[in-house]
């Protein structure tokens, strides 16, 4: 069952929608009645602004094959039918940190 905090692999769309590439995504919300959820991109590239590291200690279950970072600046609404596989679940604390970082970005108010 998909829950908020699940890490899943999907064909992630490029910003210009020209193509997709299979990448991990963090579900910020559980899928709704229509199967839609809000997620954040996950990358192995450390150089992006607003990245949050995912350490193994921050995983409730599963593991990512490489050191990975949540892209809090890449938020998407997707459908669960796109999920190729589940790879694990992050702690509720990490998921809430990502949500707070997003809220801070949207409101301009530092997370407290």
Language model features with spans:
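C-terminal terminal-subdomain/extension
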Residues: 60-112
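Compact nucleic-acid interaction/catalytic patches
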Residues: 16-21, 27-60
């Amino acid at each position: 069952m998909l829950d908020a905090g699940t890490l899943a692999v999907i064909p992630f769309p490029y910003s210009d929608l020209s193509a997709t590439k299979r990448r991990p995504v963090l579900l910020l919300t559980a899928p709704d009645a229509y199967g839609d959820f809000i997620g954040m991109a996950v990358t192995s590239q450390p150089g992006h602004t607003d990245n949050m590291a995912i350490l193994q200690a921050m995983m409730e279950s599963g593991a990512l094959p490489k050191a990975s970072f949540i892209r809090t600046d890449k938020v998407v609404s997707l459908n669960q039918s796109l999920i190729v596989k589940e790879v694990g679940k992050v702690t509720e604390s990490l998921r809430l940190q990502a949500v707070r970082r997003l809220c801070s970005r949207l409101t301009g108010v530092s997370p407290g």
